[in-house]
Amino acid sequence: VMNRLGTIKDGKPVYPMFASETHIAKEEIPVAAGIPLYIGIDFGLTPAAVIGQKVRNRWLIQSEVVAFDMGIVRFAEVLRNEIATRFSQASDVYIYGDPAGDFRAQTDESTPFHILRGAGLRAFPAPSNSVDLRLESVAQQLNKMVEGKPAFLVDRRCSQLIKGFDGGYAYKRMEVSGERYADKPDKNMY
C-alpha cells in the first residue's frame, strides 16, 4: 500500500500496544556511561540476546545479538565481543537467561550458564520462568510514559526484536471455526 513494504502477519500479536512510531527510536540510542547494562538471553540453536539499560526509569534497548544455527560456545564469544566493543562505558553487566539453560546437556556436564561464565560472562537464570510474568512485565512498560517519553524504547538496529514486537511474536490461530487463538505465544524465532 502506498509503495511501502509490509509483512504478512498470522495470529494475534502478543504486544498489540507496540507502536513503531512511539517505541522505535528515531536515532541511535547511545550508551549511558556509568549505568548498568542488562542482557536477556534465550538459548537453543538460535540463541538471542537483547541488550539495554534502564535510564531514568526508561528501558532503552540498544542492541540485539541474534544467531542462527550457532551453539552457545560461539554465541558466548560473539556476545562478549559486542559488550566489549559497544558497551565498555556501562558500569556493570547483568546477564539473565531462560532458567531452562541451567540444565545439563545429555552429552556432557556443562550448561549454557557454565559456558557463558567460562567465557567471562557472569550470567544467571532469571528468577522465574513464568511466561505470563514476562509478558506482563514487557506490556506494562509498553503502556507507560515517563516524563512524556515512552518507558520502553528500541534502537532501530534491533531488527529481529522489532519484527517480533510488530506481530512476529504472536498467539497462533487455532484450526477451528471463528477467531480462536492459543493460550500461550507461539515458540518461533521471535
Regions found by a protein language model. Give the residues of each.
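Generic recognition of flexible, low-complexity loop/linker segments
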Residues: A25-E28, P36-I39, A49, N81-T85, ...
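ATPase catalytic-site recognition across NTP-hydrolyzing enzymes
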Residues: V1-I41
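Mg2+-dependent endonuclease catalytic cores in nucleic-acid-processing enzymes, primarily RNase H-like
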Residues: V55-P185
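Acidic, Mg2+-coordinating catalytic module of metal-dependent nucleases/exonucleases
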Residues: D186-Y190
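Short, flexible loop/turn elements at secondary-structure junctions
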Residues: L5, F43-L45, P99
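Short beta-strand scaffold segments in enzyme catalytic cores
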Residues: P47-Q53
